[in-house]
Amino acid sequence: MKQLNILLSFLLIGLCTTAQPLVNEADVLRGSLNENRDWFDIKRYVIDVTPNYEAKSIVGVVSWKALAVKPSKQIQIDLQTPMVIDSILLWPNVNDGMNAVRLEFTRSNNIAIAQIEKQIPKGKQFGLTIFYHGVPKEAIRPPWDGGWIWKKDSNGQPWMSVACQGLGASVWYPCKDHQSDEPEEGAQLTIQVPKDKNLIAIGNGRKVAETNMVNINNNNRFSWQVTNPINSYNIIPYIGDYVGWKETYKGLKGKLDISYWVLRSDSAKAVEQFKQVPKMLEAFEYWFGPYPFYEDGFQMVQSPHLGMEHQSAIAYGNQFKNGYFGRDL
């Protein structure tokens, strides 16, 4: 009987092993630094995105600033299906804003390969602009299951965000979706939302602009920027009926600007709960050293999921309770 149990155990292990899916081409293309990815170093992302809550779709344009570390005539752009790339422009001289070249490209699974007619030499900085649109994958159980999040708050107002550490940032914007390459010069995220819905859009870092586009598309534009290197999955929009307030923390590197953003309906309990934040920062700095992003400030943003460590704009969804939803782990 004992020998039979051992045999059955080995058979079960074998069945489980053979049932595992093999690595496919899409995994290799996204996970490896192949010849179409390893020749350039991302320096900066500039992202402009407009979500449509009713259609659960987005329209956007993303610009890359990059440095060629060796010459090449092909470049890989990551954008997961069913998102669609409309066009790609190459700026051979990234700073002159002129002489853009439209690139031909082919799609394969979750990537695009664009052909560069005139080889970019080693040491040359160049720019890429990608126009795109589509219905991004919707997160079913964020943050563990990634994608775009479309919810409503208790007052029926749209509440949107993204969680994409596992899936990668290419689930919603075209990028070099590899965690080895962070843009050293940071990133800018502009989010457009309908003016008539009174929504606020928040991104990483500091707000650098807020403009009304009533004469063009009746949208409000909120632009945010980080100056520190940032992982692509950490660049995240938060959109909702937010209210905010600020305070200053005197930390190990001087003055740290703290901003809080919460849903209007939760503002009273949020003010009370977030009184702990300066003490938390003090404890972390005592044990782990200075907060690394003083230049970009520190934000706590109420999110439509439990939470994520999104750099300089922490996603918070713990219902304003201590512990894990009010209980110890």
Predicted regions and their residues:
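Extended, low-hydrophobicity, Ser/Thr/Pro/Gly-biased non-transmembrane segments
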Residues: 24-26, 36, 128-242
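N-terminal, polar/Ser/Thr-rich
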Residues: 19-61, 86, 153-157
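Beta-strand-rich interaction surfaces with strong enrichment in secreted/lumenal proteins
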Residues: 47-50, 64, 101-104, 115-120, ...
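A surface-exposed beta-strand-loop module
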Residues: 80-151
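Bacterial Sec-dependent N-terminal signal peptides
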Residues: 1-25
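Juxtacatalytic substrate-recognition/specificity segment
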Residues: 191, 223, 241-329
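Ligand-binding face of N-terminal immunoglobulin V-set domains in extracellular IgSF glycoproteins
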Residues: 55-82
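Zn2+-dependent metallopeptidase catalytic core
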Residues: 62, 119, 125, 129-131, ...
